[in-house]
Amino acid sequence: MAVGWNRVFAAGLMSVGLAASPALAAAPSTQPSPTNQQLLDRISALEAEVHQLKTQQQPSPEQQSLVSQERQSANPESGQVSPMAQIQADADAQSKFFDAGLVTAGYANRRFFIQSDDGNFVLRPWVHIEIRNTTSVRQNFFTTGGNDTENGFELRRARLGFDGNLFTPDFTYFINWATNRENSTLTVVNSAGATVGTTTSPVGGLPVLEEAWAKYNFHDTPWYIHVGQMHDPLDHENIVGSKYRAPEASLQGDIFGNTDTFTQGATVIFDNKGPVRVEGGVTDGIRAANTNFEDSPNGGIAYDGGVAARVEWKVMGNWKDYDQLTAYGNKKDLLVFGTGYDYSYAGGGYNQLSHTIDVQYGGSCGLFAYVCYFGRYTEHNRGIPNTGGVSASFASSTPDLHKDTYEPSVDAEVAYVINNHWEPFARYEYLYLRGTPAGSQNNVTDLSLGLNYYFYGHNLKFTGMATYLPTGIPINDDSSDVLISNRHGEFVFLTQLQLLL
């Protein structure tokens, strides 16, 4: 349509010029009348300008294709189109700000994504929600001998984040936040369960950064650089994370690993997609999430730094199946051995060496088994560290103060997937804690039975689980909804719905 309008415009200019010529000739003027040749020259100049405008307005091949499609859709048999439809199609074609074919979006492999056609830029947003109802029964909790029962709903996790790659598939990134579920006022109790005071705590519902890292693969090599806030390369259960395991991590993972073992640092990774992969580097310490650069004791930071490393050996199976603590969806039998180490140090000689040895089996038949030994050696014990999303704090005065201590623990889990939906599971744990308040029963045993139902894989999963601690536990483990119940039995019942988009 732009070409047609240019012709009309040119003809109009010529008509005006020719019509004005007699009038100009008749009017008295001191200027000499233009000759016929001069008029022809003016017409030629106007034609040149019109030709230039036509060239600038010429639609691109993509626009011509779009106009052609619009015409065919209007009358596919005759190829004719009404003037208004032609005007609309031409306007739509010329109003394109950019070629939409350069970006694609959709849903694949149970993930939403936005990416460039060449795959160099990818954004995958995600949301992870766990809605939980928990009942805790602490036997003979009160001095009168009565039980204490607590029940209620909680949004155990409400996490959002995104991951993908930038500039090249070799440069990947990951960032996510979780909402804090704590109250603004935290009640403090002693080993006997009596309230001794209150302290402030981050307000529930506020976002807390969990991970924010970048990873670069040196092209066509097995070497990677990994920097930012990430999982400490120590404990496999915590590296897997909350999306692909039981409703909550084991007590050893929560207490010894500080709930998902988030830290800040830089590591080097060797991964040639073969049977062995290694990650190791420097960190700010095992409990250094969301802290600044300052050392202890400035800013309440408990650790000055550390080094960490993990080695994994795959005997058989696919590595992707090792990223979950279940055999759900396994196409091949999986067997992997792993071991991790973390040495974290702080001012005043408070140093800590944590280590894990684990093995995971996941059969294509649905059978799953996992065993992990987690030990912790502490020099000049300051008290057992409390779990939390920001740095670390320590329990009240302990008989182990300034002593060198060692704490062993073992976690064993089995599960079996039935008909690709049902999955009964069981877990046994034993921990020996040090650095707890005076009078504590430090031998902790955890027996758990549960059942998963996969509506749509991990994306929509329902879980019911019952936990029994026959001798209780001398500290709170808020992450798993286990409350302090020193020397007395405790039952914990929970149901949970997981939504992962």
Positions of the model-derived regions?
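Bacterial N-terminal signal peptides that target proteins for export
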Residues: M1-G12
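Bacterial N-terminal signal peptides
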Residues: A10-A20
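N-terminal periplasmic/intermembrane-space "pro-region" immediately following the signal or transit peptide
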Residues: P22-E130, R138-F142, P275, L501
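Outer membrane beta-barrel
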Residues: A100, Y107-A288, I301-W319, D323-K331, ...
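Outer-membrane beta-barrel pore domains
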Residues: G146, S191-P202, G329-L501
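Active-site rim elements
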Residues: T200-S201, I255, F293-N298, Y341-S344
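Interfacial loop-to-helix transition and helix-capping segments at the boundaries
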Residues: N298-A302, Y350-Q352
